[in-house]
Amino acid sequence: MPQHFHTVRGPHQGQPILRAGEPLNQAQAAMVMVHGRGATAENILDLTVELDQPGFVYLAPQAAGNTWYPQSFLAPLASNEPGLSSGLAAIANVLAQVAQAGIPLERTMLLGFSQGACLALEFVARNARRYGGVAGLSGGLIGPDGTPRDYPGSLESVMNFW
């Protein structure tokens, strides 16, 4: 059964982070799982039945009102604020908890579905580092065609599934 772990700030303030798998302080690897619009953190954690990797902790932040941002992922970035920035901060918050527990980014994956995939992919693009992997299930980078994508860093060594 998922457990409440930590809350986030911003428009998603007061929303829990649910956990499945190993306790965070005992895990060797982590997967941050980001739910889609209209779904819940508990819904995305249902995938852990299939993923079920020994030594993994699965962490899923919950969006306020079950949506990370109000418009389509192809809408102008400004029209998805403040939810977009708050959602990105929620992912950063979960990753900070994972790092504090001693799990390196190289052993941390991000997985998102639909709107959650868009948010996870956008986070990784803006915060390029050597993650353990990224899986974007039915999603893409946020913003219309022509949105500047000159983010610093590289994702060359990251396993990606999108």
Regions found by a protein language model. Name each.
Residues 111-116, 120:
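Gly/Ala-rich beta-loop-alpha elbow adjacent to hydrolase catalytic centers
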Residues 61-62, 111, 135-138:
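Alpha/beta-hydrolase-fold catalytic nucleophile elbow
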Residues 5-107:
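Serine-hydrolase catalytic machinery in alpha/beta-hydrolase-like enzymes
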Residues 129-142:
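A conserved short beta-strand
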Residues 46, 122-126:
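Active-site signature of alpha/beta-hydrolase-fold catalytic machinery across serine-
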Residues 140-162:
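The feature captures the conserved acid-bearing segment of alpha/beta-hydrolase catalytic domains
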Residues 119-123, 145:
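Hydrolases whose catalytic domains are alpha/beta-hydrolase-1, hotdog thioesterase
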